[in-house]
């Protein structure tokens, strides 16, 4: 049974996510137009939540064009936010993904190798911020955790 407080919290989380995704999309659309990306600025985050916040605009810049403004997926790319995002096994129609996503490290390795498929690539720090943003958007609790690094990603289990 869901309480009114639970419903209010769920609505607040959805509204917060929507505002973050809209801000990220606005940033991304402002930079759409071809050409090389601006030089990669380092992502200086003191914890994983701050890193996720820095990842929002980067999602808009590097991911929203294919995966949709809210990460909902498009005819070009699957959803990366929501109930069908980050499944354990690749979809049968997957163009690039052939591996399972057990941990955040699996996701990072795939994304860093294949995404985006065209155009400029994010820096390693930017990939980590985008990953933190995606994990947080999918309900993975990052509160109190240090910034994501290649060394601590295996500790974040997505599918046991």
Model-derived regions, located:
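An amphipathic alpha-helix signature
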Residues: 101-112, 124, 128-132
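C-terminal motif of bacterial Sec signal peptides marking the signal peptidase cleavage site
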Residues: 25-28
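Bacterial N-terminal signal peptides that target proteins for export
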Residues: 4-17
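Gly/Gly-Pro-rich "capping" loops immediately C-terminal to redox-active cysteine motifs
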Residues: 72-107
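The canonical Cys-X-X-Cys-His
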Residues: 55, 59-70, 130, 134
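Flexible coil segments in periplasmic/lumen-exposed cytochrome c-class electron-transfer proteins
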Residues: 122-160
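Electrostatic cytochrome c docking/interface patches
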Residues: 30-58, 74
């Amino acid at each position: 049974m869901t309480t009114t407080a639970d419903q209010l919290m769920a609505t607040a989380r959805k509204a917060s996510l929507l505002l973050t995704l809209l801000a990220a999309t606005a940033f991304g659309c402002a930079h759409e137009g071809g050409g090389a990306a601006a030089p990669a600025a380092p992502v200086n985050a003191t914890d994983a939540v701050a890193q996720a916040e820095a990842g929002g605009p980067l999602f808009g810049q590097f991911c929203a064009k294919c995966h949709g403004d809210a990460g909902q997926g498009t005819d070009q790319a699957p959803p990366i936010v929501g109930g069908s995002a980050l499944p354990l096994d690749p979809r049968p129609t997957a163009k690039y993904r052939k591996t399972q996503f057990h941990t955040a490290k699996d996701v990072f390795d795939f994304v860093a190798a294949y995404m985006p498929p065209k155009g400029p690539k994010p820096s390693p720090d930017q990939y980590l911020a985008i990953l933190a943003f995606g994990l947080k958007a999918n309900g993975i609790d990052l509160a109190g955790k240090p910034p994501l690094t290649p060394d601590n990603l295996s500790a974040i289990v997505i599918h046991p």
